[in-house]
């Protein structure tokens, strides 16, 4: 409880700022996808690497971006496998070691990923999402009613002895990485037929929902409502379903994203016939490349909790600001060039996004340097 309090509560303003930061990032990426579609009338790629290739017309830049995308999804997958090892070890009987459970979990996901079609994997993920929302609602609504001191919970100042700035510095990268959604923006615009209004509404509401859930959960947890509820059998079952569905859904999404990137990077080794067949099903090499490295890291560190938090912090402090802060600005400026003409002056949104990304990366560098000096 203390850890949660230290990290989450003192930053309602930070959460609001992060929401608008992510919103601007998503809207700019949607503009890039729509402009790319309108200018070339081509199919906008779902792979973030191919999407960047098409926008920047540079294979080298696309490979760098693809590598960054692979790294961030690998970190998320490693965190998910590690947490699954701990969570399912507590749920399953027999007192199994978390490393064994984590290895079994990763193996099952890998087998499902290359035996099921993409549509089949999406159906599994959709079921997990439905279970996630239903279990979350069954936990949250009674927990909100069980908060003993609503005003005291809202005004609670936290217990971190290092103060507000240190708390926010530690929290922002973790929260930023957990609120990431921008990698699916090209797919969203495609599903909405590249309609600007529909895409803007979907991104605005879709990016707000995780923040609202996050704030509500923090409020219920800090107020003691969740602890009071999960002591009962029904509450404990709902919490187990919530944890399991979140891990399964997020890990499947990570594997699908990784496999798509690896399939794009290794596409030259396949013949045309094989290429046409893997559009609906991921190849075994792509799945192995996606699952094996994160699983190896998790097993080598014996499902360390510090590793998981460290990976999320690294993603939120360095990779996420680059991929979804600096990159959207660069893509927008590139796609706005007209037949050799110079790009227009950066918009206010682009300036805010780029400044925020530089600020996130800069504060992390300053923090790391100060830690080394100390």
Where in this protein do the model-derived segments appear?
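Hydrophobic alpha-helical segments of multi-pass membrane transport proteins
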Residues: 132-142, 247-258, 286-297, 301, ...
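A generic transmembrane alpha-helix motif of multi-pass inner-membrane proteins
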Residues: 304-374
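Transmembrane helix-loop boundary segments of multi-pass membrane transporters
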Residues: 4-7, 57, 86-96, 119-128, ...
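Transmembrane alpha-helical segments of multi-pass small-molecule transport proteins
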Residues: 65-70, 90-117, 130, 178, ...
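Extracellular loop-to-transmembrane helix junctions
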Residues: 3-39
């Amino acid at each position: 409880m203390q850890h949660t309090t230290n990290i989450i509560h003192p930053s309602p303003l930070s959460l609001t700022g992060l929401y608008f930061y992510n919103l601007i990032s998503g809207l700019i990426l949607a503009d890039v996808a729509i402009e790319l579609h309108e200018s070339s009338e081509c199919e906008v790629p779902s792979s973030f690497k191919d999407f960047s290739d098409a926008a920047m017309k540079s294979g080298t830049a696309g490979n760098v971006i693809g590598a960054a995308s692979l790294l961030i999804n690998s970190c998320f997958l490693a965190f998910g496998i590690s947490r699954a090892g701990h969570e399912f070890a507590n749920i399953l009987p027999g007192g199994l070691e978390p490393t064994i459970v984590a290895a079994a979990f990763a193996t099952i996901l890998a087998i499902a990923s290359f035996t099921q079609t993409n549509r089949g994997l999406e159906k599994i993920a959709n079921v997990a999402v439905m279970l996630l929302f239903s279990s979350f609602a069954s936990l949250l609504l009674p927990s909100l009613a069980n908060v003993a001191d609503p005003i005291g919970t809202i005004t609670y100042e936290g217990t971190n002895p290092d103060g507000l700035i240190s708390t926010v510095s530690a929290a922002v990268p973790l929260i930023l990485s957990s609120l990431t959604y921008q990698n699916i923006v090209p797919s969203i615009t495609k599903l909405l037929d590249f309609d600007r209004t529909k895409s803007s509404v979907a991104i605005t509401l879709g990016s707000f929902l995780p923040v609202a859930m996050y704030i509500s959960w923090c409020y219920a947890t800090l107020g003691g409502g969740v602890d009071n509820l999960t002591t009962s059998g029904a509450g404990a079952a709902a919490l187990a379903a919530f944890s399991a569905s979140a891990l399964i859904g997020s890990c499947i999404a990570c594997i699908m994203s990784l496999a798509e990137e690896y399939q794009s990077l290794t596409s030259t080794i396949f013949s045309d016939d094989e290429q046409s067949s893997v559009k609906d099903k991921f190849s075994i090499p792509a799945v192995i490349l996606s699952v094996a490295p994160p699983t190896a890291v998790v097993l080598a560190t014996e499902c360390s909790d510090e590793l998981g938090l460290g990976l999320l912090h690294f993603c939120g402090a360095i990779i996420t600001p680059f991929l979804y802060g600096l990159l959207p600005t660069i893509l927008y400026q590139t796609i706005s060039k007209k037949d050799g003409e110079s790009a227009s002056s950066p918009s206010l949104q682009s300036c805010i996004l780029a400044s925020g990304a530089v600020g996130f990366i800069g504060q992390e560098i300053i923090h790391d340097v100060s830690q080394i000096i100390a």
